[in-house]
Amino acid sequence: ISIRGFQVDLSQQQIGITVDGIANGNSNYGGGAKANRYIDTENLRAVEVSQGTADVASRSNAALGGTLNFTTINPGMDEQLVVSATTGDFGAQKTYVRLETGEIAPNTYAWMSLSSQNNNDWMDEVGEANRDHYAAKIVSYLDDMDITAYLSYDDSHEDNYQRIYGLSQFEQNPEWDQLTSDWSGIPYIDQSYRRGWSTLRENWFAYLEANMTFGDVEVKANAYYHDNKGRGDWIPPYIVDVTDDGTNGHSELVHGNTAMGGSVLGQIFFVDANGMALTPEEGCASSLTFPYGGGGAGQDWDICSAPE
């Protein structure tokens, strides 16, 4: 699915995403979540696209550039068990099971599903992506009211790809993002170790919705819950300096010490045996042009560091 919108920076996105018309936070970089955190492909009914400025009925967190509304399937009328298994290249595997309950109460139907999937990255097959997903939906058809409830839980661990920063890097090798597959033990190199660039996330999403009809008037109301927790991993070749040690060595690097936070005073790269910071020799520059497009990559500390 491709939709034209606009994005000011990594923390702002103007393409709205809803699930069954329900808001679910944002999908931005740095804490947001895409629709596949809340819906399994096998439970997807349709994707409704609103181009341009979104419909006034959209309850998305960001919808100035259009909305994608991902809708889930409704429970079937008959009891049945749906099972699927998928395999593919690069260690791709997925197992999916859904139980259709049939009628569990007068005019009330439900389904429950679970799935587990994993695959390796396609560049060097070192990075991994693992995901477990659980979901359930129940619908009750009453005389003048339909009540729908949905719950999903998603637990994922994804080793990431790095973006390509320019034509020269693409021409060098269009099928490599320049993250490395082997741990060298050298921080300058290992900041690009693929398995250190990871996203770990648990997502909960639930809603309860009622559709009511009063003559020619239709009223829709819902309550929803959304929660996510996790972290994003990367391997900078430094430790943040939060302790003012004066002329002494950096205490953050002394075994057994615990730095309890504080204001950021700088960054600690390489030190000598006494914990004293080393600085690059004059004129010694980095040959590393990735990650971050070379920005923040630092100097070749291992070959041109000297005591301050």
Provide a role label for each language-model segment.
Residues 1-23:
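Extracytoplasmic beta-strand/coil segments of soluble accessory domains associated
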Residues 22-51:
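Short acidic/polar hinge/loop motifs at secondary-structure boundaries
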Residues 44-49, 61, 65-67, 72-87, ...:
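Transmembrane beta-strand segments of Gram-negative outer membrane beta-barrel proteins
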Residues 50-52, 79-82, 117-121, 186-194, ...:
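Extracytoplasmic loops and strand-loop junctions of Gram-negative outer membrane beta-barrel proteins
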Residues 80-82, 87-163, 167, 197-213:
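Transmembrane beta-barrel wall of Gram-negative outer-membrane proteins
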Residues 128-133, 164-175, 179, 236-246, ...:
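Flexible, surface-exposed loop regions and adjacent strand-edge segments
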Residues 132, 191-234, 303-308:
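Outer-membrane beta-barrel transmembrane strands
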Residues 222-308:
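Surface-exposed, low-complexity loop segments enriched in small/polar and acidic residues
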